[in-house]
């Protein structure tokens, strides 16, 4: 399993029509974003005074992420993307 560092997040992209709260996203929104599930998170980032700021997302969250963000990676037969937390636009609450 991949363990991201810092503020990076490992995502499993959902390969289906995107909906948010039961609403289908418009075609233009689907081209700019994708829906994914958080598989793993880094420990967070440190502030200048050394405090650790934990990620805003957690394993299992469904998120909306910028379509072209991140790096495509494979772990065995599974495909994932690794993004910085700043590339995650929203947590999808059901």
Curated annotation (Swiss-Prot):
Origin: domain of life: Bacteria
The keyword Glycosyltransferase is annotated on this UniProt entry: no
CC terms in the record's Gene Ontology section: cytoplasm
Subcellular location: Cytoplasm
CDD domains given in the database record: cpn10
Keywords of the record: Chaperone, Cytoplasm
GO MF terms held by the record: ATP binding; metal ion binding; protein folding chaperone; protein-folding chaperone binding; unfolded protein binding
GO BP terms, alphabetized: chaperone cofactor-dependent protein refolding
PROSITE patterns: CHAPERONINS_CPN10 (PS00681)
Gene3D superfamilies assigned: GroES chaperonin
PANTHER family tied to this protein: 10 KDA HEAT SHOCK PROTEIN, CO-CHAPERONIN GROES
Function: Together with the chaperonin GroEL, plays an essential role in assisting protein folding. The GroEL-GroES system forms a nano-cage that allows encapsulation of the non-native substrate proteins and provides a physical environment optimized to promote and accelerate protein folding. GroES binds to the apical surface of the GroEL ring, thereby capping the opening of the GroEL channel.
Subunit: Heptamer of 7 subunits arranged in a ring. Interacts with the chaperonin GroEL.
HAMAP family registered for this protein in UniProt: CH10
Sequence similarity: Belongs to the GroES chaperonin family.
Record NCBIfam families: PRK00364.1-4
Protein name per its UniProtKB record: Co-chaperonin GroES
Organism of origin: Streptococcus pneumoniae (strain Taiwan19F-14)
Protein encoded by which gene: groES
């Amino acid at each position: 399993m991949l363990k991201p560092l810092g503020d990076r997040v490992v995502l499993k992209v959902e390969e289906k029509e995107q909906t948010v709260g039961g609403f289908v996203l418009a075609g233009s929104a689907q081209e700019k974003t994708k829906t994914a599930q958080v598989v793993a998170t880094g420990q967070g980032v440190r502030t200048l005074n050394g405090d650790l700021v934990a990620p805003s997302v957690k394993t299992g969250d469904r998120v909306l992420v910028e379509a072209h963000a991140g790096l495509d990676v494979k772990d065995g037969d599974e495909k994932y993307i690794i993004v910085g937390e700043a590339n995650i636009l929203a947590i999808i609450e059901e």
